[in-house]
Regions:
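AMP-forming adenylation/ATP pyrophosphatase catalytic core
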Residues: 1-123
Length: 123
């Protein structure tokens, strides 16, 4: 597994490498998709990190109960080895915020009471 990592600073508006996505503050939440998530800014610790998977990674997939090992999630999603190797993770400290293009971690997902919402969109 490669150890390359990229960082996102506070108030950064877009990311070009390794993936192209936009970051913006919004006032409300529309329907999330695989390519769009809405997160609670107050739960994030900057700089955020974009990295590949590590042994033992786990997250709390949105829409599911409890935590799941990333390896088990990949298996359940029937992802090929190439797909797994090409999947990037958006992390806050060491916690996965988003399996980019797949699923967000419910601990970070914005809800009706969230004050500061950030929309992340894969372009």
């Amino acid at each position: 597994l490669e150890n390359e990592a990229y960082f996102i600073k506070t108030n950064q508006k877009e990311v070009k490498i390794p993936l192209n996505f936009s970051i913006c503050k919004v006032n409300d939440i529309s329907s999330p998709k695989n390519t769009i998530i809405f997160v609670d800014e107050d739960k994030l610790q900057f700089p955020l990190t974009i990295r590949k998977r590590n042994e033992g990674d786990y997250f709390y997939p949105s829409g599911m109960k409890g935590k799941k090992k990333l390896s088990k999630y990949f298996k359940d999603e029937k992802m090929s080895l190439i797909e797994k190797e090409n999947t990037w993770l958006l992390c806050s400290k060491n916690k996965i915020v988003w399996v980019i293009g797949k699923r967000a971690d419910q601990q970070f997902v914005a809800n009706k009471t969230t004050q500061n919402i950030i929309k992340l969109e894969l372009l």
